[in-house]
């Protein structure tokens, strides 16, 4: 990562637009391809997929951006433990999202993915409070609102991906008769 890279408000909003456009394609495809019956079978595959995806995201992010971003907002021990914490927390969150989605009298895919987006915005509100847009030089001057907005659409994309992976895992399990 170039030391002089600057994440600006404009870049965050452009990123939000890109994620929103991808979400606008991803969600209808999931609604088309994942029936309510199938979604009910995705309880544990979504937990496993979420744990693995979020472990991977955080292992990559901490590995790539520890010095330039995360060392400014996390304690030193987080460099080792955040990916593992994400593994456990994401699995638990996936279970909660799945339970919420099957209980709400609304589209289960939209509930699962949009609530994932809300969680993203909440985590970025926390990051803003910790100084994510004021402490790291590469983010100084970026709008806190833009950081929260991009998180909403970015996390919808991640939770759509988790749901797609869960469906693939479930399909493979049925085809290969695993467990």
Task: Kindly give the residue locations of the regions a language model identified.
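Aromatic-rich, lipid-facing transmembrane alpha helices and their immediate juxtamembrane interface loops
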Residues: 1-179
């Amino acid at each position: 990562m170039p030391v002089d890279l600057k994440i600006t408000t404009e870049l965050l909003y452009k990123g939000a637009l890109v994620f929103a456009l991808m979400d606008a394609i991803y969600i209808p495809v999931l609604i088309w391809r994942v029936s309510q019956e199938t979604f009910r079978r995705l309880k544990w595959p979504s937990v496993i997929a979420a744990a693995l995806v979020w472990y991977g995201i955080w292992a990559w992010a901490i590995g790539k951006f520890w010095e330039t971003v995360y060392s400014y907002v996390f304690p030193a021990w987080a460099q080792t433990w955040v990916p593992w914490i994400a593994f456990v927390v994401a699995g638990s969150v996936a279970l909660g999202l799945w339970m919420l989605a099957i209980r709400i009298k609304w589209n289960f895919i939209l509930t699962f993915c949009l609530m994932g987006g809300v969680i993203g915005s909440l985590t970025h509100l926390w990051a803003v409070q910790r100084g994510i847009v004021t402490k790291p030089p590469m983010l100084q001057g970026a709008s806190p609102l833009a950081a929260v907005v991009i998180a909403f659409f970015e996390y919808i994309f991640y939770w759509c991906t988790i749901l797609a992976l869960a469906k693939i895992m479930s399909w493979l399990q049925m085809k290969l008769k695993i467990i």
